[in-house]
Amino acid sequence: AVPVSLEDSHPTPSLPVRPPVLCAGCPHRSSFYAVKRAMEKLNQELPDGQEPVEGVYCGDIGCYTLGNAKPLDMVDTCLCMGAGITMAQGMQRVEPHKRYFSFVGDSTFFASGLTGIVNAVYNEANLTLCILDNSTTAMTGHQPHPGTGRTMMGQVVEKVDITKVLEGIGVKHIRTVDALDLEQCVETVLEFSALEGVKAVIFKAPCIAIVKTTKKCRIVEDRCVDCRT
């Protein structure tokens, strides 16, 4: 036998790097893609010779910060909670020919988004609010917030309605869409982003980490190969 030292053996390769991503089945994936697809469709349908319309996508703090990763690549800015709304206002004043989208989750909407929206309406900013409503505070552990209908002690109470809050602030154009209905989302984004002023699209679908699937598996016995999977 030939003695072999540990130094002569092949080193164990490092594990491949896997960047953080949105969960498989996360409705935020669909919401981001709908806005991306809407802007692509807008530019595809422009008359020949017309300059393409550039979209600016202002992100925020939450799971949806991961919208910055490819292939979505839909977060141009991320500073702090609520900043996606206020940063879009400032940039829109300097480059008004672009279309501005401010992404904010339902939890961040209540925690830090309201003051920025009030300011946007009052100062007649031109931007599209994309409220990603998954009915929880997903990133930090699924804590309740005023839109969930449950207090921090677990008591069931009446939800604070996001649409009514927006109406009270003065947002004129508000629509709730199924975040997983791509066609509906794309058409709504195209329609709303062309309007003047502050407008809001509420992309609603539950967080995949808390929803229980209604699909049931069954065995087709005459095709079963006993694979145990």
Specify the residue positions occupied by each region the protein language model found.
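Generic structural signal for bulky hydrophobic/aromatic residues embedded
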Residues: 29, 35-38, 93, 123, ...
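Thiamine diphosphate
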Residues: 66-200
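An N-terminal assembly and electron-transfer interface module characteristic of large anaerobic redox
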Residues: 1-2, 125
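Short glycine-rich anion-binding loops that position phosphate/pyrophosphate groups of nucleotides
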Residues: 63, 205-208
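Active-site diphosphate/adenylate-binding microenvironment
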Residues: 3-84, 97
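Structured core elements
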Residues: 22-25, 34, 56-58, 101-103, ...
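Ferredoxin-like iron-sulfur electron-transfer modules
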Residues: 9-25, 176-194, 207-229
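A generic structural signal for short, non-catalytic loop/turn and secondary-structure boundary residues
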Residues: 50-52, 56, 170, 194-196, ...
